[in-house]
A protein has these predicted regions:
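Sec/Tat signal peptide C-region and signal peptidase I cleavage site
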Residues: 18-23
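Positively charged n-region of N-terminal signal peptides that target proteins for export
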Residues: 1-7
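Bacterial N-terminal signal peptides
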Residues: 7-17
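Tandem repeat scaffolds
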Residues: 24-219
């Protein structure tokens, strides 16, 4: 009789949804890695380092503060997704669709976004050092206060983009479309501009900062 009551209780718990956490976790893993489709999934703070997520559908998903270092997201659909504060260092995002995605404060240094779709995406205050954005579409994107030093933006579309106070030191902008882009306050030091010429006029700011930091360290 006791065994009967125990198993009846277990069945009741299962039907009441107590085990939904385990079931839902298995579900998103199946959708993400097997079906390659996890639209509007909540993956906030998930550890997906070095995950093979090429061509996966993740549109409108939540990936805030997710660990995606060195993940393969080539050709992935991340349109409208939220990746605020996400770690994407060294990730492969070649040809990925990030249209309208929110990447504010994300860490993308060393990531490959060649030919990626980033129209009207929010990349403000993100770390984009040494990022490959060759031929990427950044039309209307918000790149305010980003660190784009040593990045490759050759042939990229930056029409109407916000680059206010962006650090473009040693960046490559050869052949890029910067029409109607806001570059006020941007650092252009050893920067290759669309014409192919090297711009040095903004070097005074990083030099002053370097001098200031040196003095602080010497104290």
């Amino acid at each position: 009789m006791n065994h009967f009551v125990f198993f009846s209780f277990l069945i009741l718990l299962m039907h009441s949804g107590i085990f939904i956490t385990h079931a839902s976790e298995t579900d998103w893993e199946n959708r993400l890695f097997i079906k390659k489709e996890c639209i509007k999934c909540n993956l906030n703070k998930h550890d997906l380092r070095k995950a093979q997520l090429n061509n996966v559908m993740l549109s409108e998903s939540l990936l805030n503060q997710a660990e995606l270092q060195e993940a393969n997201l080539q050709g992935a659909d991340l349109s409208g997704a939220s990746l605020r504060g996400a770690h994407l260092e060294g990730a492969n995002l070649r040809g990925a669709n990030l249209r309208g995605a929110d990447l504010e404060g994300a860490y993308l240094n060393g990531a490959d976004l060649t030919m990626a779709e980033l129209e009207v995406a929010n990349l403000s205050s993100s770390d984009l050092r040494a990022v490959k954005l060759l031929g990427a579409n950044l039309q209307g994107a918000d790149l305010g206060n980003t660190n784009l030093s040593v990045s490759d933006l050759a042939l990229s579309i930056l029409k109407g983009a916000n680059l206010k106070n962006a650090n473009l030191q040693s960046a490559n902008l050869r052949g890029a479309d910067l029409s109607k882009a806001d570059l006020s306050g941007a650092i252009l030091c050893n920067t290759q501009v669309p014409s192919g010429e090297i711009e040095y006029r903004g070097c005074i700011i990083p030099l002053l900062l370097e001098s200031f930091n040196t003095k602080i360290q010497d104290q």
